[in-house]
């Protein structure tokens, strides 16, 4: 895939991209912020072999990824949920 990603990627393209790259930028609408956001993530939790997940929930494509820049919660968790992402780079 080239550097100029189309505005809306297909689910299989997103899944292949995140699995093939060490890090990526993922863009999606975040209900928490009521806006479109872009986050830097990785498909595998650092220093482990624990991988992210993809599921269809209530008809939506949901990707669970490790947010590299997120503030960890009290358990050290930085997994985040991207619903219907529009692109990854």
Which residues fall in each region the model found?
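Acidic, low-complexity, intrinsically disordered interaction modules
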Residues: 35-57, 70-74
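Intrinsically disordered, low-complexity regulatory regions enriched in Ser/Pro/Gly/Thr
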Residues: 17-18, 57
